[in-house]
């Protein structure tokens, strides 16, 4: 029987893919260890049905902490140990300093002109300098202290108004709190359409999580349309662009001292100067970073900290005793009151170890061919550092899966990427530039929630019944919302 035209075309397409796959596979002489692969999709079948960071961690434990994965068209190195993280993020840091191009970056992030996705080069270096000296400096983060304190107090009042003994949706409340803090830091006021804005940010994060068909087959443009990804991202971008345009149009640049500048003030000042000229799209891309990278990560960290404390009553009691003893009945908490509270900081460190905000960090890309430990790595190979696996490596951490804040007592370990067994914000040139802001947005809200209220699970459930299931996405979120009952 003669083959139909459709079948012939489909068969020819499959044979073409198989040929390309076979010829590409033979081109690399010294290949890294890898699982068995299939034509066309490569190793994707090993990750189907898994949470990506856990699926990759399980493969690394079988095939090695430096392994290769073929994700569709994309050749990928996966690093899952402190040893290889240190080697690559120091010796080969500049070699892997680029970002892979993605459909999300192209459409949503204004052609990859934000801080996170910008390709390595002069523009990115200027952005990094802008973050270090202006947007995310310690001084600038400190300047937002009063608004953090005010919004945290508003949250406390809102929870009290809901009544003692009634369940509170902490997931919703915490996300709203962080979004409000960041919107005031960026624009000097809350966003009128904040609910719509935060929903758009959440949808962007959902679209960037995992391994999307558009990203594993970047050259197959028809798949971007067939999967509906391009249409979804275009729709998201149009809504987002309209919202940000309105916010910028409503904003009046202050003529006061730099210490009172909002983040948008800084960007508009630089946009109109020769110091570091920015386009309107550049400004919007950077503003998006402040929310996309800041809201979800900080709120998730607070949620996980509270979840772990509910699950571990001993640690919950210890941190609350420390807070209440230090504050001694004080009504409002100021940041100076909690800077030296050691156990609170241990709780945050341990939460970031078990639940790093970006478990696979942001992928990097090789800028040139390189020989790594005897293995030939082609140009444009993607690099994934599995921080989730590194932070739980049993060779470096005793009882690695257990929440034990005391493990950091008398330890010089910091969150800033100096110790490669603990990388909550990554390391090297492309390390998260917003670590200081993120920590400030975690510490004070967490202290307020723990100081003012005692918490328990609804319906008389015991502490060990809390659902700790993770969701699928760019950040490690709880799968279910955190509903707890306050008493005060």
Curated annotation (Swiss-Prot):
GO terms for cellular component: endoplasmic reticulum membrane. It catalyses: (+)-(R)-germacrene A + 3 reduced [NADPH--hemoprotein reductase] + 3 O2 = germacra-1(10),4,11(13)-trien-12-oate + 3 oxidized [NADPH--hemoprotein reductase] + 4 H2O + 4 H(+). This is Germacrene A hydroxylase. It is a single-pass type II membrane protein. Gene3D superfamilies: Cytochrome P450 (1.10.630.10). It comes from Tanacetum parthenium (Feverfew). Pathway: Secondary metabolite biosynthesis; terpenoid biosynthesis. Keywords: Endoplasmic reticulum, Glycoprotein, Heme, Iron, Membrane, Metal-binding, Monooxygenase, Oxidoreductase, Signal-anchor, Transmembrane, Transmembrane helix. InterPro entries: Cyt_P450, Cyt_P450_CS, Cyt_P450_E_grp-I, Cyt_P450_sf. Belongs to the cytochrome P450 family. The keyword Cytoplasm does not apply. Expressed in floral glandular trichomes.
